[in-house]
């Protein structure tokens, strides 16, 4: 399994917030929603992304930006344009002084802005909840990534632009998966660039010893894995395997496995709402619902029942 796909095959977009914005200069949006990760694609025109503690970056048509939260940032036609809209948690939109918006409004299915057409069109996809994106992935990302249109070729942005305005049964699930695919494809391109400082866990999948162990852990999480068993499968000594895994991945094998099992459990809780906590626990390698619940709450701050209901 591809390392990025593996990370997003656990917790992933679930009823993600997706929006098509149609904007006419001057415009400026201050984002303070606290979302862990937001993906933006410029379909038409240009947009500046201005982190509070970083350099302003210009997005041109076809470019993609990935902003890692929860720090606020500005998206505008010009860095000097004063904020006109404040976007708060839950995607609540207000004027900077807390009033109701009057200049921008819904102008179609998942479409918002100054009118039905305009010189700037942006697509935004937000992973709004903790646990929807791996902590390991978030820790590897800078506050802002901009991937230029010239750096890659993908049909995903035009497809998302086409699908985002459809109001048909099952469309939320379609958009969630498209957002995941676009994120994975964008980050893969980013990490594979010449000279890229890809994180250790990404490079580890290319290691002949550690890569094989990662595949076993990801595909068979319910197995009673031990360091000795993984080492035997890799054909190396226990000590050599533990040292190589920790050096390559950045954490010991059992620590990695524990986090992976919880990531899968989080996904299963939402994918299969009728499954008992005990059934989910056994699927991911926990001996009881109590053991899973205790570990889950330590990781996510919520019980499995609370996470499923959120």
PLM region spans:
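Generic protein-terminus/edge-of-domain signal
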Residues: 1-65, 71-114
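Short hydrophobic/aromatic patches on the structural cores and recognition surfaces of FHA
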Residues: 39, 45, 62, 125, ...
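Short, charged helix-to-loop "capping" segments that act as catalytic/coupling loops
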Residues: 51-55, 267-280, 285-288
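Short hydrophobic-aromatic micro-motifs
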Residues: 65-68, 122-124
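Amphipathic alpha-helical segments enriched in hydrophobic/aromatic residues interleaved with Lys/Arg
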Residues: 99-181, 185-186, 190, 194, ...
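A short, Lys/Arg-enriched amphipathic alpha-helix from helix-turn-helix/homeodomain DNA-binding modules
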Residues: 149-165, 175-179, 183, 187, ...
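Basic/polar phosphate-binding segments, predominantly the helix-turn-helix DNA-binding elements
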Residues: 181, 185-191, 212-219, 223-263, ...
């Amino acid at each position: 399994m591809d390392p990025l796909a593996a990370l997003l095959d656990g917790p992933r977009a679930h009823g993600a917030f997706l929006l098509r914005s149609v904007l006419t200069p001057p415009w400026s949006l201050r984002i303070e929603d606290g979302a862990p990760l937001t993906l933006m694609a410029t379909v038409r025109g240009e947009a500046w992304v201005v982190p509070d503690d970083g350099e302003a970056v210009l997005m041109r048509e076809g470019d993609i930006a990935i902003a890692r939260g929860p720090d606020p940032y500005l998206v505008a036609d010009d860095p000097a344009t004063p904020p006109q809209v404040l976007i708060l948690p839950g995607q609540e939109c207000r004027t900077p002084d807390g009033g109701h918006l009057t200049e921008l409004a819904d102008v179609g299915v998942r479409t918002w802005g100054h009118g039905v057409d305009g010189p700037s069109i942006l697509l935004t996809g937000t992973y709004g909840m903790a646990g929807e994106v791996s902590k390991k992935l978030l820790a590897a990302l800078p506050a802002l990534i901009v991937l230029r249109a010239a750096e890659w070729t993908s049909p995903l942005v035009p497809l998302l632009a086409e699908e985002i305005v459809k109001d048909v049964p099952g469309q939320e699930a379609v958009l969630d998966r498209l957002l995941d695919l676009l994120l994975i494809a964008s980050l893969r391109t980013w990490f594979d660039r010449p000279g890229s400082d890809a994180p250790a866990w990404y490079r580890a999948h290319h290691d002949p010893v550690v890569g094989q162990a990662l595949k076993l852990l990801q595909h068979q999480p319910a197995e009673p894995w031990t360091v000795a068993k993984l080492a035997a499968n890799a054909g190396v000594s226990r000590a050599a395997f533990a040292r190589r895994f920790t050096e390559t991945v950045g954490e010991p094998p059992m620590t990695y496995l524990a986090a992976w099992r919880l990531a899968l459990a989080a996904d299963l809780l939402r994918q299969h709402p009728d499954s008992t906590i005990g059934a989910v626990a056994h699927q991911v390698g926990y001996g009881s619902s109590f053991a899973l619940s205790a570990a889950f709450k330590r990781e996510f701050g919520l019980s499995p029942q609370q996470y499923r209901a959120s």
